[in-house]
Amino acid sequence: MRILLTNDDGIYAPGIKALRQVLEKEGKYELTVVAPDREKSATGHGITVHRPLRAFDITFKNSKVRGVSVDGTPADCVKLAVEALLDKPPDLVLSGINSGPNLGTDVLYSGTVSAAIEAMINGIPAIAISMGSFAFEDEEYLRAAEIFARLLPRILEHPWPRDTILNINIPNVPLEEIKGIAITRLGVRKYINVFEERKDPRGLSYYWMSGEAVNYENGQDTDTAALARKEISITPVHFDLTNYHYLNELKTWVKALEGALATG
């Protein structure tokens, strides 16, 4: 099986390193890493269209896996890999392991999730993998990678719709402390943001943003609630943002709107 690894934390980040090491050690997969050359978290699904992209082959210590560093976004990395860099499209794209969770409305900002969605747009099955809390030690990422590697063969036994990615959040705890696996929907996760104004040497203002996450909607079937219970959350996510519940009501506007076009 050909697997493309990517992320939004950068090609040298500990999460993607751990995932590569664990999957390479298993010897069952043909791996390629194409990832941003630097931190690209919270870049969403942006792509680069107003300048050229640069890609450089890199080598990983004690590894035979091909690596390509790209000066673009996570979505750029997947597009470039699939459409230009690889001889054959991958059978699967894995995005992560992200440093920190991607829960609820995080998925709208997440470069990790967006890379998986870009793969899905190209007809390739994809999984986004994130740590349930921010991790700082390589051992934490290796533990999460080993947990995911146990799950992957079982996941692949059950093909999922091609308009859908799987968004997986793994609690940052030892395997024996994980309480189970929950199939979840997205919760609502917002942030209380603070913008700190500073001055540059020319006296011009610039702003640093920081924020604290707030889980507004924590139904027991949400990803946020599952992670709080120390469960692995698996959420099917797709890019159709249509509000189907509101479609019929919106259709009642048509005559009035057409009337506005006909008058005056």
UniProtKB/Swiss-Prot annotation:
Record-level Gene Ontology MF annotations: 3'-nucleotidase activity; 5'-nucleotidase activity; exopolyphosphatase activity; metal ion binding; nucleotide binding
Binding site residues for a divalent metal cation: D8, D9, S41, N98
EC number of this enzyme: 3.1.3.5
Catalysed reaction equations from the record: a ribonucleoside 5'-phosphate + H2O = a ribonucleoside + phosphate
UniProt cofactor(s): a divalent metal cation
Broad class of enzyme this protein falls into: hydrolase
Subcellular localization(s) per the UniProt record: Cytoplasm
InterPro entries associated with the record: SurE (IPR030048), SurE-like_Pase/nucleotidase (IPR002828), SurE-like_sf (IPR036523)
GO cellular component: cytoplasm
Keywords from the named record: Cytoplasm, Hydrolase, Metal-binding, Nucleotide-binding
Gene3D superfamilies (UniProt xref): Survival protein SurE-like phosphatase/nucleotidase
Pfam family, one: SurE
Coiled coil is among the record's keywords: no
Note accompanying the cofactor annotation: Binds 1 divalent metal cation per subunit.
Family assignment from sequence similarity: Belongs to the SurE nucleotidase family.
Protein name stated in the entry: 5'-nucleotidase SurE
Organism: Carboxydothermus hydrogenoformans (strain ATCC BAA-161 / DSM 6008 / Z-2901)
